[in-house]
């Protein structure tokens, strides 16, 4: 429906509307930092959080590498919508329910709309940079996990249940859903178990860009 409304509008209107919709992701980050009295567990280092922060940058700058990166990173929001079991416990139409599902829906949908509305062109040449940037961010986030967990242990920081807090951004420490559990069963080592996902990412990106690659060859 959003695509139908915007497809004949000029680029400024398209960008402005998508920027407004992307604010749900930013507001969700702020909400989680404030609402649960444990901001260290809700820092914006998950894949979908980083995606939420990158969407406005891509929309404002029209940067091709960032825009094409979003196509891969939006998958994190889709996975969160499908397999996050804790979200199933949210009270229907509560603030928590709405901020979670609205923000993740837009974090998945806006990157698709960016390309469908031709605000940024699809470019298969960005596949290497997308994979390299993703790997670098994953490495950085893993070290953030290690550093924060050491800080938590030293300062004995505990959650509302009295358990020692363990941060697990981007799930580099341990799996949090059946899909990641499969890879952890193959390689039961923190961080390393996530790496076999990159060949899958590569195949996913090739499938997305194949029509563009074929079209470009025909145009030559």
Residues covered by each model-derived region:
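Alpha-helical transmembrane segments in multipass membrane proteins, preferentially the mid-helix core
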Residues: 2, 55, 106-125, 138-139
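Aromatic-anchored segments of alpha-helical transmembrane domains
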Residues: 23-33, 73-86, 134-143
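Membrane-interface helix caps and helix-loop-helix hairpins in membrane proteins
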Residues: 33-42, 61-64, 85-99
């Amino acid at each position: 429906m959003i695509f139908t409304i915007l497809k004949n509008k000029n680029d400024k209107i398209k960008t402005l509307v998508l920027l407004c919709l992307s604010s749900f992701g930013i507001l969700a980050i702020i909400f989680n930092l404030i609402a649960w009295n444990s901001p260290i567990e809700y820092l914006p280092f998950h894949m979908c959080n980083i995606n939420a922060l990158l969407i406005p940058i891509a929309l404002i700058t029209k940067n091709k590498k960032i825009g094409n990166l979003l196509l891969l990173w939006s998958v994190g929001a889709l996975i969160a919508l499908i397999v996050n079991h804790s979200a199933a416990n949210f009270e229907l139409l509560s603030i928590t329910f709405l901020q979670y599902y609205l923000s993740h829906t837009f974090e998945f949908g806006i990157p698709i709309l960016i390309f469908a509305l031709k605000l940024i062109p699809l470019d298969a040449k960005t596949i290497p940079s997308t994979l390299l940037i993703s790997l670098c961010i994953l490495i950085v986030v893993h070290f953030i996990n290690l550093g924060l967990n050491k800080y938590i242990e030293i300062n004995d920081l505990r959650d509302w249940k009295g358990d020692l807090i363990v941060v697990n951004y981007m799930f580099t420490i341990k799996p949090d859903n059946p899909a990641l559990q499969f890879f952890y069963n193959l390689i039961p080592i923190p961080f390393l178990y996530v790496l076999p996902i990159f060949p899958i990412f590569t195949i996913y990106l090739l499938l997305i860009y194949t029509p563009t690659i074929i079209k470009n060859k025909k145009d030559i």
